[in-house]
A protein has these predicted regions:
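Active-site-proximal substrate-binding groove within the catalytic cores of carbohydrate-active enzymes
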Residues: 2-268
């Protein structure tokens, strides 16, 4: 196994101050063979409880080789090991959820969480087209990052609506005060009781807006005004997302500021 840290981009040294400040732990890369054996142990335990739902944090997300000269494994070989393991899980009747969704793993997944829905972190990009989600929609269920852990909760919700993504939350049962002064304060907004009402309301809104679309392809994605985007699904149903801080009129239908709504398909 190999222990890794966050690194200072200037000094190229392990940045303990950054790690402490951002509450990040060091983490480990393990031998690919050990990782696959660990999956078997995990799946056996889960199946033992009568469940066939398997969630993966690293398989399908993190890809690393093993460069020990006594037992060298290339990244390509590690990829093949992951694919074979995912194939085995599907053949065993399991439903598989993966994180992020590397292309080689997506065909074997039933749900992908933490998919990157937004490229605007790159300042030179003026506009973006959601090619990846357009290609996958109707074939696999996916979501962006956890709504309640987002830097901008509303932006996350709007981007999920524009991309035809599902909703994803991270919860804990304990009061978040138990995390104070610990390594996991990034989960400060995860108490289930605090989010239960808002979660139910948001799920109901998504279910009503996107009813009948999750198994349909995205036929068209277009910018219809500054800060306003329209996604049209197979069959004609469309959703307009308004990122602006003022209301928008679409064919006589008012789309509230920082909100989204289902509209009739067709031209504006």
């Amino acid at each position: 196994e190999c222990e890794l840290y966050n690194w200072d981009p200037i000094t190229y040294q392990a940045n303990d101050d950054y790690t402490d400040y951002h509450n990040y732990d060091s983490y480990y890369l393990v031998k690919p063979s050990y990782a696959m054996d660990s999956v078997d142990t995990y799946v056996e335990k889960v199946n033992g409880y009568g469940s066939k739902n398997i969630g993966m944090e690293d398989i399908g997300n993190t890809l690393a080789g093993d460069y020990n000269p006594k037992d060298r494994v290339s990244r390509e070989a590690a990829l093949n090991l992951q694919v074979k393991k995912l194939q085995s899980l599907k053949q065993g009747g399991n439903k598989v959820m993966i994180t992020s969704g590397n292309q080689y793993a997506v065909p074997y997944a039933d749900f992908v969480t933490d998919m990157n829905l937004d490229a605007r972190a790159v300042n030179i990009i003026d506009e973006q087209v959601p090619f990846y989600t357009m290609a996958l929609h109707g074939l696999i269920n996916y979501s962006g990052g956890a709504i309640n852990l987002a830097d901008d909760e509303k932006e996350n919700i709007l981007k999920s609506a524009e991309s035809g993504a599902g909703l994803y939350f991270t919860y804990i049962a304990e009061k978040t005060s138990v995390l104070q002064d610990g390594k996991y304060t990034r989960y400060y907004a995860c108490n289930y009781d605090d989010w239960k009402k808002d979660t139910l309301s948001l799920y109901n809104k998504f279910n009503e807006t996107f009813e009948g679309t999750y198994d349909k392809a995205i036929d068209k994605h277009e910018k219809i005004a500054e800060g306003v985007y329209k996604t049209t699904f197979e069959g004609g149903k469309a959703v307009v997302v308004n990122y602006n801080y003022s209301n928008y009129q679409y064919n006589g239908q008012e789309i509230a500021a920082r909100d989204f709504a289902a509209v009739k398909g067709g031209e504006e």
